[in-house]
A protein has these predicted regions:
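Positions that flank functional sites
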Residues: 45
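C-terminal catalytic-base region of ester-bond hydrolases, centering on the histidine
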Residues: 142-203
Length: 203
């Protein structure tokens, strides 16, 4: 077992009601520091499709964008963090993703999901079968560099502590609004630091 400090392509996955445009500042910052940054629009982005179907879009994007076996890193914001986890834990992403960074992701659900009657929102309700299944083997994420970044003031992830997980690294930031997380300079620099962290390779 050894460590390597690779600089992989980075794929940014947005949240519900968002587009890839929400990562404008983060993308510019990372590109300015030498990263090959990718993002695309999940479709539909308003919760009509299940998160598992959205995760398939990551698979399709990766297959058409990168050569076979090319490792890459994932950054998922809000719902995008759960979609990214599903790709890693259920769709074979564990073989290619070396770093996964979840920003304000509802790992254990958000009570606000009860106010939106769609499949995607249902899959983000606390104690729902989808999240219970995904969290059943959350220790899988210990096989990669996993980082959770969250704010205690998050009014979209209720409770905000739903963004905490018992694996990987945790970064707590005093950002006042959910949507500000991906624009806040402290969060962007925390993402850069996590992307620079050496990965452990099992021989």
């Amino acid at each position: 077992m050894n460590q390597t400090q690779t600089r992989n392509p980075v794929v940014l996955i947005h949240g519900i009601f968002d587009t890839a445009g929400i990562f404008r500042l983060m993308s510019a910052y990372l590109r300015g520091r030498g990263w090959d940054v990718h993002s695309f629009n999940l479709c539909p982005n308003y919760g009509l499709a299940g998160l598992d179907r959205l995760a398939e879009q990551i698979s399709h994007y990766v297959e058409k964008t990168f050569p076979p076996g090319q490792p890459f890193d994932l950054v998922g914001f809000s719902m995008g963090g759960i979609v990214s986890r599903y790709y890693v834990q259920r769709l074979g992403g564990l073989d290619r993703v070396q770093r996964l960074i979840a920003i304000s992701a509802p790992h254990y659900g958000t009570w606000l999901a009860y106010f939106y009657p769609t499949l995607g929102a249902f899959q983000m309700r606390p104690y729902c079968p989808f999240l219970c299944d995904l969290n059943r083997d959350i220790e899988t994420l210990d096989q990669i560099n996993f980082t959770s970044i969250w704010t205690p003031f998050d009014a979209m992830i209720l409770p905000a502590s739903s963004s905490r997980v018992p694996v990987g690294d945790e970064i707590l930031l005093d950002v006042l609004l959910h949507a500000w997380m991906v624009r806040d300079s402290r969060c962007i620099k925390a993402v850069e630091k996590a992307l620079r962290a050496p990965v452990t390779i099992n021989n």
